Amino acid sequence: MAPVKTPNQNLLQQTAPNKVKVILLKLVKRQIFIPIAALLILVIFNLIADPSFFTISLSQSSSGDPVLSGYLITILDNASELVILAIGMTLVTAASGGQDISVGAAIAISGSVVLRVLCGTDSRPEMLHAPIIVAFLACCIVAMLFGAFNGALVAFFKIQPMVATLILFTAGRSIAAWINNNELPIISDAKFGYFGNFIPGIPIPTPVFIAIACMIIIALVMKFTNLGLYTQSVGINAYSSRLNGINPAFIKFITYVILGLCVAVAGFIKVSRFSTINYSVVAKDIEMDAILAVALGGNALSGGRFNITASVLGAYVIQFLTTTLYKFNVLSSALPAYKAVVVILLVVLSAPVVREKLARLTKKLMLAKTAKEAV
């Protein structure tokens, strides 16, 4: 004899699906839906194509220490610089309604400054010419000055962001080479390599921790200051913001300075990874990936409302996609084409109009299902 269901059991069975439907509808409308959906698609694809993609194992670093290895670790590690840049690029985009296309060249400059401070005029120094902290501070100051230069052109001279940053985009790598007299110094100090690789005894790459630290810092700044509110206000309507006592020019300027600081951190990691940099190719096209991360996060490239968490997820989506393509032996020369097709689809799906239509379609399907169940 079949067990008789009580009214409470029937109520619970009806309530649970309704809660799931409500959550799903809310998620579809949320800005963070697209990067989460993209990550899930990539995860499912790799699970079907090759489940070993998610294997994490212990291996030995070059110094003989046990470290974690696997594609997931590679994604977290290699995405670190992009995540840091995506944070700054989100603020710049929200405030100015434009993007900074010079971050790749600025990374080359900041890395060149690190090499100059630590190596001096010696291309193969046996010992560092200055403490590492001094090199990092010098790198930050120079990168923030270049950020201030871009910010001044945009905020005070009213030049379009892409045109203003095109100056440094064009000249930046030549400046980086000039700083070290067209030489490529190599840093042999083991401790300096900790920042871009592994710290002995810690099996997770150091850049992962640096990226997390940057996320925590920007989250605290957003929570305990009005920077986020002012940035959003200026991006939505600069004139109204001025009437409310906000200085739009200063807010735009400060976001470029913050992006400069993010560039400095990314440049420092780049140099630490390889003990040197090639000025002409280091961080090449990373500005495009940073802009795509912002777009994939559902942020309007015309400025206004923004979500840094969504941009960070967008950065991880891009790196996940890149690693997946390499995993399946896609030629590096063909990688941009594959990447562009997938990114175009994701960007179209992240458009507010498309998201609204998806939400309506989801709602209709759920209502139809509910009506069918009722019958």
Q: Locations of the language-model features?
A:
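Single transmembrane alpha-helix segments in multi-pass membrane proteins
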Residues: N46-L47, L68-T121, V154-I159, V294, ...
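Transmembrane helix-bundle core of multi-pass membrane transporters
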Residues: F157, P161-F224, I251-I254, R273-A283, ...
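Helix-loop-helix "hairpin" substructures at the membrane interface of multi-pass membrane proteins
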Residues: P131, L137, L145-F146, P203-N278
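Transmembrane alpha-helical segments in multi-pass inner-membrane proteins
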Residues: V263, N278-A340
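Alpha-helical transmembrane segments within multi-pass membrane transporters and channels
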Residues: S123-F169, G314
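Cytosolic-side transmembrane-helix boundaries in multi-pass membrane proteins
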Residues: M1-I48, T55, I236-Y239, L243-F250, ...
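Hydrophobic core segments of alpha-helical transmembrane domains in multi-pass membrane transport
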Residues: I34-I48, M89, C139-A143, F169-S174, ...
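Inter-helical junctions in multi-pass inner-membrane proteins, predominant
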Residues: T55-S57, S63-T74, I179, G228, ...
